[in-house]
Regions:
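A glycine-/small-polar-enriched, mobile loop at the entrance of the PLP active site in fold-type I
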Residues: 77-78
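Long recognition/docking surfaces used for binding and targeting
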Residues: 1-74
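Conserved S-adenosyl-L-methionine
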Residues: 82-191
Length: 191
């Protein structure tokens, strides 16, 4: 009985921590975090249990993309009449484009943000080439971070006509470590 009570208290404490983090996110971006979490403390414990061993910083772009698309379900199966460019084609196009940290990138029909993410990843890879010791050297880390983060913040833009998919793109950008502030909901053809 005391074990059950201890578990309930742990679940409740975890629930409160998750809710506080969510509210913190909501203060930063009300559009992305506008829905309330409707999970019980037990279900949150289960989700956290699955995710706690996952390090998104060390997970490659394709794996994160597949996981995100699976998690988001019907958005990415064309149930809303949109067509999502296959990851291999997105990667090919971004690879052949001369995207640098000072390039401006605009995707007028950004969908889930695939082109934006691959462009960001390309610039981040270039930063890693320029600052190979960024993980150990604080000065290099600051330069490495500034190199790709400035690109994400100032040069990377997405427009998506569907408000729900625009929010999904922002979430996808957050999962991939920033750049979500320049994704807007609008008609990219007329804007």
């Amino acid at each position: 009985k005391s074990e059950t009570k201890r578990r309930l208290i742990e679940n409740d404490n975890l629930y409160k921590r998750v809710m506080a983090l969510y509210e913190e996110g909501r203060k930063k971006d009300k559009e992305v975090f506008r829905d309330n979490i409707r999970l019980t403390p037990e279900k949150i414990r289960t989700v956290v249990g699955y995710l706690e061993s996952v390090n998104l910083g060390e997970t490659d772009l394709d794996s994160k993309g597949r996981a995100f698309e699976t998690f988001m379900g019907s958005f990415f199966r064309g149930n809303f009449g949109q067509y999502f460019t296959p990851r291999e084609i997105v990667k090919f196009i971004v690879d052949v484009l001369p995207i640098e940290h000072d390039s401006k990138v605009l995707d007028t029909s950004c969908g889930s943000g695939g082109f934006l993410l691959y462009a960001l990843n390309k610039v981040r890879s270039k930063a890693t080439e320029l600052y190979p010791n960024y993980a150990k050297d604080v000065r290099q880390h600051d330069r490495w971070f500034k190199y790709w983060h400035d690109f994400a913040e100032k040069n990377l833009y997405g427009i998506e006509i569907s408000e729900q998919i625009s929010r999904a793109a922002k979430m996808n950008m957050i999962i991939h470590d920033d750049g979500h502030t320049n994704v807007i909901t609008s008609n990219g053809i007329w804007s």
